[in-house]
Amino acid sequence: PPRMALYLEYSTRIYSIYLKYIAPEDIFPYSIDEVFMDVTNYLHTYNMTPRELAMTMIQDVLKTTGITATAGIGTNMYLCKIAMDIVAKHIKADKDGVRIAELDEMSYRRKLWSHRPLTDFWRVGKGYAKKLEEYGLYTMGDIARCSIGKENELYNEDLLYKLFGVNAELLIDHAWGYEPCTMEMVKAYKPETNSVCSGQVLHCPYDFEKAKLVVKEMTDQMVLDLVDKKLVTDQIVLTVGYDIENLNN
């Protein structure tokens, strides 16, 4: 069962190991169990390839905590995410359970332009995929080719902007393996509004008491986040999604 306090303890321990190798300004925690790192300026210092540096940190985490890891290496943040989410999941783990996958713009196009479903890709939800499929666009390769269509053709970038507005720009970039956002930009971002959130996916139905415990632990963690960010609030929103089949048990 989810144990938020234990997850946080291990997340903190693992993050402290990363800090032995990488400065905090070059690390962006994406979730409790996932981070982005910009290691560009560290490769020469350590005289390592990106894969060697990733493996060194993963082995340190494994030795210290007993937890193995999967890593995605890319020439930008998007390709790192895709390398981990899609490519690494389809390669054989080593004896320690470690999977490391690498992508650059060209290998992304070779390996993943025909990959389906589109919802496997970062930031492509079911709504996006459905709209694209209605126009016969089923892959990232289809989207990329559509983006360079001529003005008098049905398939061109105007179609994508018609479907998604300004969001089409990022979709087109991702179709080609580009990502305009850098680590520096992410770290410098200041939201107009402040909020914190937390989520858990339960792998089996929970009774009331177990579910209440999970919600309490998540709330406690968000309170700590608020304190850390020097924020106060008078509102909390709880959203519960469920598989309707579980109601039949």
Feature roles, as predicted:
Residues 1-179, 183:
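Gly/Gly-Pro- and Ser/Thr-rich, intrinsically disordered tail segments characteristic of DNA damage-repair
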Residues 120, 128-249:
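DNA-contacting surface of Y-family translesion DNA polymerases
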